[in-house]
């Protein structure tokens, strides 16, 4: 059984900060450090793509101070981590509606995508920013209408071509933080995913935890609706 595409709902930064008597922005910063470790391990494990939920459409409802801190963290993370990602042959792509973060952040994101572009990356790192699965499906329906695509011509390929999500399917979805819900993430792409819910808060999630999730995946049986 192959494991090519992994997605992670990186939940628990705020609770981790509160537990450690730190500011929320410090929790998010520690979350970036955790992601850095998982990216390295994904390369080591020959994973083809890692798709992470960084900021949802619902997250715009958070306090302005927190959104601003996340905005600054995005820019600083690109400045500090991009060269190392390129050295690891990691291709970075952001998806979702992140225009509200402002021109500076938008331009920094495009710079990161262009500079890390590769036709043969060791890992595709997809970052969901201002993304929601329901809105993605709504936008797909609008595009189908705008392009006047016949109902008989709509298939899985059509949906994947019109979706914002770079990957057509996810093999393994991991959610940290203890909650057992999908939270509007990759609703179409996780149709046959193995889903692992992890109690640890995201900043505490390590490469050892990641390896355990990978091993658990290989010990499962994916039937895709078939009888064995």
Predicted regions and their residues:
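Flexible, compositionally biased loop and terminal segments
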Residues: 1-228
